[in-house]
């Protein structure tokens, strides 16, 4: 089919690399670093980031449980279109519950999705928070904030877990590359 033709033409196996983790755990940093590294290696890849999609594709959504679900549903549907076209996506989204992760997996397809848990303790995330969102959440200025006033369920069985508290982003990116390249490498 079309996807096989595109994968062969692009010389890669299309996958959705889904980064899940607390706010300020390092998803965007890892996602953009990974995108650059993969582009440098000759892969065709697109970063989809929560902060960006919420300004465009999902600008009509808030942070209620229903809106979070719709946010993930839309992103998963877009990701599926990319994968069906032979393109790799890197998705940096909090995706706080197993239910939402399952929804993404159902839409994208289990074989197409590589789940990465970007792990960092909440104290570390809070210390990194330049926008002061955690502080605002603790004072009640921001409601439904993941990790403070809304739950974050630790992924039960991610394909890979990366700890961003102890290593520099460059080291984390190198580690992720080692894990991901064999999965997306094209073999004729």
Task: List each model region and its residues.
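Conserved beta-strand scaffold positions in the cores of enzyme catalytic domains, especially
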Residues: 47, 113-117, 159-161
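The conserved Walker
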Residues: 23
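ATP-dependent NMP and nucleoside kinases share a basic, alpha-helical "lid"
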Residues: 56-62, 79-138, 144
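Residue-level preference for the first positions of well-ordered beta-strands
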Residues: 14-16, 44, 88-90
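Extreme N-terminal, non-catalytic leader segments
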Residues: 1-17
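Small-molecule kinase domains that catalyze NTP-dependent phosphoryl transfer to phosphate-bearing small molecules
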Residues: 119-175, 183-188
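Conserved substrate/cofactor phosphate-moiety recognition/catalytic segment
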Residues: 32-77, 84
